[in-house]
Amino acid sequence: MILLFINVIYTIHIIRDIIKHQQQEELDKRKKNIEEMSLQLMQMLSTTIEAKDEYTKGHSHRVAEYSVLIARELGWNEKELSNLKNADHLHDIGKIAIPDTILNKPSKLSEEEFSIIKEHTIIGANILKNISLIDHVQEIVRNHHERYDGNGYPDGLKGKEIPLHARIVTVADSYDAMSSQRIYRNQLPPEKIIQELENNKGTQ
C-alpha cells in the first residue's frame, strides 16, 4: 500500500513537471512571436521615417549592406552577419521621436536642434530594451554615433570601449552619408570617401 502511494505521488510530480514544461514552452513561443511582430513593426516604422526624406530613403538598408561587407572581411560567420544586418535596419529607430522639422531641415542644425537629434540613440536603445531576438541590437542603436577619440555621443565612449558591432555600423553609416546626395552638399565619389575615412582613422 505504501509503495502504491509513493508511486502515485511520484507519478503526480512527473505529470506536474510535464505540464509546467509545456506551459513554459508555450510562453516562450508566445514571447518569441510577440518579439517578431514587434521587430517587423519597428522595421516598418524605420522605413517610414526614411521615406519622408528623399535624401535618407533606403539609408538603413544601405548601412546594413555595407556593415555586412565589412564584417565579412573580418571573418564573421553567416549567423553573425545575418544578426548584424537585422540590427542595422533598426539603428535609427529612435528617430521616430524626433520632430520632422528637425530631421528634414535643409540647412545646418542649431545647437539646440542637434542636442535633440542626439537623443535618438538613447530613445532607440530604450525602445529595444526588451528585444532579445537580435544580439547586440541595443549596443548598436545606442553607440553608433560614438567616436574613437571619445568625442561622440551619447556616452563619450573611446577606442575599444565602443562595442565592435557599433564601430562597424559607424563606418558604414559614415560611408553612406558621404556617398549620398544632400541639399547642402554633393555626394562624394568612392575614392574620395575612402580617403576621408583614412584621414579620420583613430578619431571617428
Enumerate the predicted regions with their spans:
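Juxtamembrane or sensor-core-proximal signal-transducing alpha helices
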Residues: 2-32
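Metal-dependent catalytic cores of enzymes that make or break cyclic nucleotides
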Residues: 39, 46-204
